């Protein structure tokens, strides 16, 4: 849990319109690709309301998770070591993964964020962080670098994911952090990082969002995040072939005062798409009955409050769209109402956490 919190903190970023998603450096053969861009001016993250919401959430979470109290200290430690402001609305990421037949993942992440390369190098050297090599580019061992930034991140580094190694295969390379310039960092195993770095230098063709997917992405208003899945680049399976699944695109965007999400799945034919559309619409139709619960079983006030929040979330889900070989789920929530719903969920969780028996002190 601590590792996930810390990694989320380190990679916190938001996004720009779809035409400004920067995929340069992302290998075109990745099965799953994602990107974000600057959040500057977005109500969801770069507004007085968003900042006030974030402050309230940090205070609430700190009351139930002691390690959360150190988030500001971690941010300051990272800024002192790298010059990077994790809360800058101009931070962006792009990357992706490919999956092997045995289920092993390979991929990388490009972080586009202003930082001080000299300061980062001096810090890594002073902390004696191990080095790795991606072609002609030197980098640092990612786990060791993370551990060197702060005591809390050092604890998280113990849970750092180790690259999987197939039985009988040579030991896998560690994940490295490669600093290309004051605006670009690459996180990947050395061999993959070398490939990404070459693409960033213009040596080869990077991934490009398919033109057929742009209407779905742009339909969210001002898109600020996108994830694309290409089934043809996933390991083949009889189940996937029979389903006719070709791929999917997920996008989040801001349209006026609303947050809009679209998730579209594509199939080889209208007939192959129909089962998913029917199942999804059926689940939505059953939602009110599921929320009503069993009248013979009394609900606590907390449970009633949570069901009301879930009802508000579901109310933002639009009817399933089935058009030809495409099935689309659209959600729309008013931004301030969304903040309120999330705040209520956290508050209920905090109340339950405080009421739960505490582990005995050792």
What does each model-found stretch correspond to?
Residues 3-14:
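Sec-dependent N-terminal signal peptides
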Residues 167-242:
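A conserved glycine-rich beta-strand in the N-terminal activation segment of trypsin-fold
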Residues 92-101, 248-254, 315-322:
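Short amphipathic beta-strand and strand-loop transition segments with alternating hydrophobic
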Residues 244-273:
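Helix-loop elements that line ligand-binding/catalytic pockets
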Residues 169-191, 313, 321-326, 338-339, ...:
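An acidic-aromatic pocket/loop used at catalytic or ligand-binding sites
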Residues 19-167, 171, 217-240, 276-314, ...:
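Structural boundary/hinge residues at secondary-structure and domain interfaces
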Residues 32-34, 103-113, 183-188, 261-266, ...:
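Short cationic amphipathic helices and targeting signals
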Residues 113-117, 190-193, 268-272, 332-336:
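Helix N-cap motif at beta-to-alpha junctions
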């Amino acid at each position: 849990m601590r590792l996930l919190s810390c990694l989320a903190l380190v990679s916190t970023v938001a996004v720009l319109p779809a035409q400004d998603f920067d995929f340069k450096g992302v290998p075109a053969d990745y099965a799953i690709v994602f990107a974000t861009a600057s959040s500057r001016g977005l109500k969801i993250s770069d507004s007085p309301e968003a900042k006030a919401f974030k402050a309230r959430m940090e205070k609430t979470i700190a009351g139930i998770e002691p390690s959360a109290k150190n988030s500001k200290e971690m941010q300051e430690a990272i800024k002192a070591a790298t010059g990077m402001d994790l809360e800058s609305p101009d931070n962006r990421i792009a990357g992706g993964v490919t999956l092997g037949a045995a289920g092993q993942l390979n991929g990388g992440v490009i972080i586009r964020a202003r930082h001080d390369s000299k300061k980062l190098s001096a810090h890594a050297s002073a902390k004696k962080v191990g080095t790795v090599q991606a072609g002609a580019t030197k980098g640092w061992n990612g786990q060791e670098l993370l551990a060197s930034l702060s005591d809390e991140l050092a604890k998280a580094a113990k849970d750092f994911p180790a690259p999987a190694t197939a039985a009988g295969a040579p030991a896998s390379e560690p994940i490295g952090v490669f600093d290309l310039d004051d605006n670009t960092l690459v996180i990947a195993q050395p061999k993959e990082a070398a490939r990404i770095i070459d693409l960033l230098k213009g040596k080869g063709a990077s991934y490009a969002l398919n033109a057929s997917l742009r209407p779905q992405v742009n339909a969210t208003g001002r898109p600020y995040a996108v994830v694309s899945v290409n089934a043809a680049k996933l390991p083949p399976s009889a189940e996937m072939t029979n389903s006719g699944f070709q791929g999917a695109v997920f996008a989040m965007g801001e349209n006026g005062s609303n947050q809009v999400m679209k998730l579209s799945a594509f199939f080889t034919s209208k007939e192959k798409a129909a089962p998913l559309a029917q199942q999804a619409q059926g689940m939505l139709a059953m939602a009110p009955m599921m929320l009503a619960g069993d009248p013979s079983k009394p609900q606590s006030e907390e449970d009633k409050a949570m069901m009301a929040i879930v009802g508000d979330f579901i109310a933002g889900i639009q009817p399933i769209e089935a058009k030809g070989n495409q099935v689309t789920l659209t959600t729309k929530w008013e931004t301030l109402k969304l903040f309120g719903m999330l705040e209520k969920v956290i508050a209920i969780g905090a109340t339950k956490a405080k009421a739960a028996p505490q582990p005995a002190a050792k």
